[in-house]
Amino acid sequence: MAHSRARRRKRASATQLYQTCKLTGTCPPDVIPKVEHNTIADQILKWGSLGVFFGGLGIGTGSGTGGRTGYVPLGTSAKPSITSGPMARPPVVVEPVAPSDPSIVSLIEESAIINAGAPEIVPPAHGGFTITSSETTTPAILDVSVTSHTTTSIFRNPVFTEPSVTQPQPPVEANGHILISAPTITSHPIEEIPLDTFVISSSDSGPTSSTPVPGTAPRPRVGLYSRALHQVQVTDPAFLSTPQRLITYDNPVYEGEDVSVQFSHDSIHNAPDEAFMDIIRLHRPAIASRRGLVRYSRIGQRGSMHTRSGKHIGARIHYFYDISPIAQAAEEIEMHPLVAAQDDTFDIYAESFEPDINPTQHPVTNISDTYLTSTPNTVTQPWGNTTVPLSIPNDLFLQSGPDITFPTAPMGTPFSPVTPALPTGPVFITGSGFYLHPAWYFARKRRKRIPLFFSDVAA
């Protein structure tokens, strides 16, 4: 292993060492003579300069610069150097000015005043000036009457034609003869020119009419499987009806399955389903087919981060639940409408059942307007497995074969007087309840129209 050589640190200059070690007396022996210019070379120059004068050659211990003028090559003359700097102004000679005459001015006498070229003063004459005017006896009255101008314009109207030109009126004379003049304008036959259809055949696929039929725009597709959405499959059936149970506990904000759901989390909590953690919004559902399946989808918005302005930042997730596969039926089954029966029909393929009992021994119940009586004696008979229609009471007996009229016990007249009697034993009322008509078994439910696209989600 090669050892790296230590980096050599630069020694301080002699001037820096002199400033710190002069006071303490710890300077190296070569620092003080160099700074104070007391080296051997300095001493030789000092002693040799007593007998030899070198001028401005600049010979010394400093760097060799050749003096102020620099080195000059041999055999050439030195060029004059031009120093840069502010140019000195030429000196201005100041001449002193001394008074040659005294500054006292003597007064001049009045007789010495000469007014040369001055205008003479004319004394003003008393009186006014005359005004010459022409004598005019006519008063200055201006004629301000309004001058009327008449403008006549003639234009030609091709629509209007004077009737006297086209067809003159017949003159009438008073001599007893009526003369009727024929019109001077004769009619000419009108020439009929057949109109030709001007058709231009063109290969351009332009509009063939003035008002073309607008085309149908393609339906926008919902981008549920883009890279911006994270795909999560939900297996809980509650996602179809009450998705709020998978996010929060008893959230009253939820209003229905076909609207967007919003959630607000005031504190840190765990969602009932980990896949719905930090969800703040569920968009409207959409039902579509995906690879042979009926798929129920919703887009959720996470609120992982929020800024000071209140804006939430988070990922968007596509939750989907596969309801059922779409497969071809193994066989076609004809469906019959379930309607009310119009006549009495019996199942001829039902199991034969012939009870060995006299119909007259069956308990008969008499229902009157006011009283209800029943015979206390009853006959118990075991029942067999019989197919009975829903619209027929179970107190009638069915028998395979054609329609059979069963004998019935004669009913009492409701107008005959009936003496009420107290029952001596327990009362058994044989009968059945009511049967709902088959047409009312399946009540009509209002179908909710679920849109196949998200109305509040950008595709």
Curated annotation (Swiss-Prot):
Chain positions of motif Nuclear localization signal: 1-12, 442-450
GO molecular function list: DNA binding; structural molecule activity
Bridged cysteine pairs (disulfide): C21-C27
PTM: Highly phosphorylated.
Entry keywords, A to Z: Capsid protein, Cytoplasmic inwards viral transport, Disulfide bond, DNA-binding, Host endosome, Host Golgi apparatus, Host nucleus, Host-virus interaction, Late protein, Microtubular inwards viral transport, Phosphoprotein, Viral penetration into host nucleus, Virion, Virus entry into host cell
Subcellular location: Virion; Host nucleus; Host early endosome; Host Golgi apparatus
GO cellular component labels: host cell; host cell endosome; host cell Golgi apparatus; host cell nucleus; viral capsid
One GO term (biological process): microtubule-dependent intracellular transport of viral material towards nucleus
HAMAP family (alphabetical): PPV_L2
Family: Belongs to the papillomaviridae L2 protein family.
Assembly notes: Interacts with major capsid protein L1. Interacts with E2; this interaction inhibits E2 transcriptional activity but not the DNA replication function E2. Interacts with host GADD45GIP1. Interacts with host HSPA8; this interaction is required for L2 nuclear translocation. Interacts with host importins KPNB2 and KPNB3. Forms a complex with importin alpha2-beta1 heterodimers via interaction with the importin alpha2 adapter. Interacts with host DYNLT1; this interaction is essential for virus intracellular transport during entry.
Record's function text: Minor protein of the capsid that localizes along the inner surface of the virion, within the central cavities beneath the L1 pentamers. Plays a role in capsid stabilization through interaction with the major capsid protein L1. Once the virion enters the host cell, L2 escorts the genomic DNA into the nucleus by promoting escape from the endosomal compartments and traffic through the host Golgi network.
Name under which the protein is recorded: Minor capsid protein L2
Name of the gene encoding the protein in the UniProt record: L2
